[in-house]
Every structure is written in C-alpha cells, then in structure tokens.
C-alpha cells in the first residue's frame, strides 16, 4: 500500500476535502492520507504547481500525489494518472508542470473510473457528475493506485508527451519572472540562483541579495535563495507583493 498526499484549493470551510477523503477511505482503507495544502488561492494553477514542486522532494518515493485544482472541471480537459518515481493523479491542465521537472513521468493513463454513489439520497435524486471530479474521478483512481493495483485498470494509456504543461521554465538567469507568491507576500521567481552580495531588479527596484530576511532593516526589500531552491523577493516583516507592487509574470533580472 502507498500513502496518498492530497493537495487542493477546496479550503476547509466546506466538506469537499472530507468527502474526497471519505471516498479514499472506503476504497482504500489501509493507506494513510496526508494533507499537503487545501487553502491555496482558488483556481491558481501556478501557485499549486509551485506547492507541489516545493513538497515533492520530501515525499516518500512511490507515494500517490492527488492534486485537485481544476478550473476546467466538467469540460473537455482530460483526467490523468502519470507514473514516475511518484504517482500523480489529477486534471491534465498543467498542475504538475514543475513537479515533472523533478520527476518526468514515464507512463500516463486517462481515467475512466466508476463514480462513487451516495449512501443516502432523496427519492429519484442523483448527484451531479460534472463539477466534483475530486470525489467522482480522482479519488477512486488514487485509491486504486494506493492499493498497488495496475494502472491499466484505470483507462487507456496515452503518450506522456501529450500531457499538458504550463508555459513555465526554471532558469539560471540572468532573466526570469515572478512565478507566484506565498501567504506572506514573498515573490517566488523562476531563477535558480541568488548570488549573495549582488542585486536583482524587479518592479523597477534594485533589490540586494542576502542570505535571509534579517540581514536588511525592517521594512526593506531583500532577495535570497528560498527553501525550494528558487530566488525569492521579500520585505523584512512585510509583504513584497504589496510594498513593491509585484505581480505574477513580472520580469526579474540578476544584476
């Protein structure tokens, strides 16, 4: 049995996370289900892709990564399982782009699972099947794989080259872009270097590169190599997003 690591933008105010975990528990009662994140910004694929990139190196190899950030739910976008050192289940919308830089998938399958049925329902009532694929499509597939069952039982195999990817690239520089922001307002960039003592330019500002936040005065901007190995821009005890007016996709340049 393999553990399942579950990431979504469902939040915790509604029962969506619990319902998905209930389906997992019913179909695969043995494997552990570990929450990666559920308070991601709704429908933000770049933020979710970064969260998976940040977490993946610390997950046990062979684990099932169930990720549901799915703006196109119910449309023609595909539902997939992809197999590498880890196993990925989710929408084929680029969500796994950065994770697959670390772990390129070797095989991929379209998902055609049976849909879970509710244990109680009003007479003549049936749940909608187009808006909750986390429950109806991805959870059954993740449970199947967590039990070690063959992926061929999920649906037809497809070439891994056809899997969707976001137009993102990590680079040594000198130019990159703001990839996303964490909850503190720190800007995570696509740059893989942060030469201490140098500077970066972003949002029309020249920002010093240091090892950590406390090496600049409170309220001052600073760039540094973040915990996931990407250059980040922060404001010591503040929000770089707000204080510097930064936005996703904004150019960043090593000076």
From Swiss-Prot:
Protein residues bound to (R)-S-adenosyl-L-methionine: 186, 227, 232, 235
Pfam families, per the entry: SAM_HAT_C, SAM_HAT_N
Assigned EC number: 3.13.2.3
Enzyme class: hydrolase
Organism superkingdom: Bacteria
Subunit structure: Homotrimer.
Catalytic activity line of the entry: (R)-S-adenosyl-L-methionine + H2O = adenosine + L-methionine + H(+)
GO MF annotations, alphabetized: hydrolase activity
Family of the protein in this entry: Belongs to the SAM hydrolase / SAM-dependent halogenase family.
Site residues, Important for activity: 70, 77, 133
The organism of origin for this protein: Thermus thermophilus (strain ATCC 27634 / DSM 579 / HB8)
Keyword annotations from UniProtKB, A to Z: Hydrolase, S-adenosyl-L-methionine
Binding site for adenosine: 9, 70, 186, 235
Matches recorded under InterPro entries: SAM_HAT_C (IPR046470), SAM_HAT_N (IPR046469), SAM_OH_AdoTrfase (IPR002747), SAM_OH_AdoTrfase_C_sf (IPR023227), SAM_OH_AdoTrfase_N_sf (IPR023228)
Known function: Catalyzes the hydrolysis of S-adenosyl-L-methionine (SAM) into adenosine and L-methionine. Does not have chlorinase or fluorinase activity.
Protein name, as recorded: (R)-S-adenosyl-L-methionine hydrolase
């Amino acid at each position: 049995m393999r553990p399942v690591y579950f990431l979504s933008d469902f939040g915790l105010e509604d029962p969506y996370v619990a319902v998905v975990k209930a389906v997992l528990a019913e179909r695969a009662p043995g494997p552990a289900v570990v929450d990666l994140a559920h308070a991601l910004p709704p429908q933000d694929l770049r933020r979710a892709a970064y969260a998976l990139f940040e977490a993946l190196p610390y997950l046990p190899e062979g684990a099932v990564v169930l990720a549901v950030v799915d703006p196109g739910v119910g449309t023609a976008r595909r539902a997939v399982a992809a197999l590498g050192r880890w196993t990925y289940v989710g929408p084929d919308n680029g969500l796994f782009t950065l994770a697959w830089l670390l772990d390129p998938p070797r095989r991929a399958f379209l998902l055609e699972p049976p849909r879970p049925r509710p244990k109680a329902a009003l007479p003549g009532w049936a749940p909608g099947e187009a808006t909750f694929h986390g429950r109806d499509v991805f959870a059954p597939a993740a449970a199947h794989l967590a039990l070690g069952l063959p992926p061929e039982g999920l649906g037809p195999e497809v070439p891994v080259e056809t899997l969707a990817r976001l137009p993102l690239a990590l680079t040594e520089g000198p130019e990159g872009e703001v990839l996303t922001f964490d909850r503190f307002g720190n800007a995570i960039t696509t740059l893989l270097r942060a030469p201490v003592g140098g500077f970066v330019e972003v949002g029309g500002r020249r920002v010093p590169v240091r090892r950590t936040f406390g090496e600049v005065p409170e309220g001052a901007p600073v760039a540094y190599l973040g915990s996931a190995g990407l250059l980040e821009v922060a404001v010591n005890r503040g929000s770089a997003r707000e204080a510097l007016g930064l936005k996703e996709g904004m150019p960043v340049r090593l000076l």
